[in-house]
């Protein structure tokens, strides 16, 4: 929070009352999980606030965690995925970081959308009647943090939530205010930085030598053609070169190995390093590095840190996104879980094509989701639901 405050020149002593609410868009939703209740505050037109409460006859956090896990399993998120392993969390932790469902006496859900329907009924239906804007911003709490909001299913309309709304997520209301009102020091820029498949063959983590990521390279090359930008690939994607460009671009896309929990991205070791064996500071892009950079980026896309092991890494996603937001980025696009490499490529091509056509990040995201949902090969929820836009909605002049 201190980083965010310094970047956006907001005093830590500032009070967030009516003045704060006046700066936030309508249909901003704050959710809080109590012992047996879920509390909702929805910002309306004219600074009005709608308050509501959903009472549950059980421990709210445990039940919501159970529902979330059921949803993941029912749509196939927990199944192995055919994709490049860009995550080093399991190596760092010396164990698999796959999340296990909490114990519950609840009987298994019966149909594919059962948990998605129940999640909708618990956290959207109580406030659906006051969500009158197409764009909604959700500030979740506890077990609701980065639930699969786009795939929540309304049994009445037979629609997924993303079909009715363009959804963004914010780590906190104060964070959202800082991001949506950047300082006067912000300078417009139209350039893009695309980083893919850094040369990491000299790097060992936990005794394991990192391997190349050809799909990551293919990804940024294809995006580069859409944006008419030459990407940094292989040996050119050094930490020194990336750091020198970070603060001068409007768009950052990184497809590389990463450690989500530590907030680290692995780049090509600087060639002029003093020792043959690269040290961490030669190749690791860390949260501390980002804290020292004044980013001008309107959008950061992180296509890294995922594996095919059926993991959902909500806390890590928030952490690394906060680092980029704290360094000055306006918004960050991340994925909660890994998807098939071909599906990821299809998604990215659609997303960037809509961006260059002038659509906002949230609209381009929805269009890309819809593109996959209507496709023959990637129509299942596990392919289009993981992508989350954290922070502001932005337009890019590319």
For the regions a protein language model found, what residue spans apply to each?
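Catalytic cores of enzymes
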Residues: 12-69, 75-398
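Short, charge-rich amphipathic alpha-helical segments embedded
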Residues: 1-7
């Amino acid at each position: 929070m201190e980083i965010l405050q310094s970047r956006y020149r907001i005093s830590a002593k500032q009070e967030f009352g009516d003045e704060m609410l006046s700066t936030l868009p309508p249909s901003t939703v704050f959710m809080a999980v109590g012992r047996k209740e879920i509390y909702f505050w929805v910002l309306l037109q004219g600074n009005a606030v709608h308050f509501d409460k959903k009472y549950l006859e059980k421990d709210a956090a445990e039940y919501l965690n159970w529902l979330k896990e059921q949803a993941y399993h029912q749509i196939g998120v927990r199944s192995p995925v055919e994709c490049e392993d860009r995550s080093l969390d399991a190596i760092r932790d010396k164990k698999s970081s796959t999340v296990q469902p909490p114990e519950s006496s609840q009987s298994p859900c019966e149909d594919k959308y059962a948990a998605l329907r129940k999640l909708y009924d618990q956290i959207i239906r109580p406030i659906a009647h006051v969500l009158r804007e197409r764009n909604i911003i959700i500030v979740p709490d506890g077990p609701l943090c980065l639930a699969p909001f786009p795939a929540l299913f309304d049994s009445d309309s037979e629609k997924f939530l993303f079909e009715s709304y363009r959804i963004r997520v914010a780590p906190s209301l104060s964070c959202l205010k800082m991001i949506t009102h950047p300082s006067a020091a912000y300078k417009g820029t139209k350039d893009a930085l695309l980083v893919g498949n850094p040369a990491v063959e000299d790097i060992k983590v936990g005794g394991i030598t990192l391997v190349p990521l050809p799909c990551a390279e293919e990804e940024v090359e294809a995006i580069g053609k859409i944006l008419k930008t030459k990407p940094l690939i292989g040996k050119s994607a050094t930490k020194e070169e990336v750091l020198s460009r970070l603060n001068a671009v409007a768009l950052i896309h990184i497809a590389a190995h990463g450690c989500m929990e530590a907030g680290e991205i692995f780049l090509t070791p600087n060639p002029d390093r003093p020792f043959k064996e690269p040290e961490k500071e030669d190749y690791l892009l860390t949260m501390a590095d980002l804290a020292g950079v004044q980013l001008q980026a309107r959008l950061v896309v992180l296509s890294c840190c995922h594996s095919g092991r059926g993991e959902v890494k909500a806390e890590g996603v928030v952490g690394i996104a906060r680092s980029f937001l704290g360094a000055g980025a306006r918004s960050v696009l991340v994925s909660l879980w890994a998807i098939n490499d071909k599906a990821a490529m299809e998604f990215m091509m659609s997303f960037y094509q809509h961006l260059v056509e002038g659509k906002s990040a949230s609209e381009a995201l929805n269009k890309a989701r819809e593109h996959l949902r209507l496709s023959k090969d990637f129509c299942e929820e596990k392919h289009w639901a993981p992508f989350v836009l954290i922070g502001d909605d932005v337009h890019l002049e590319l």
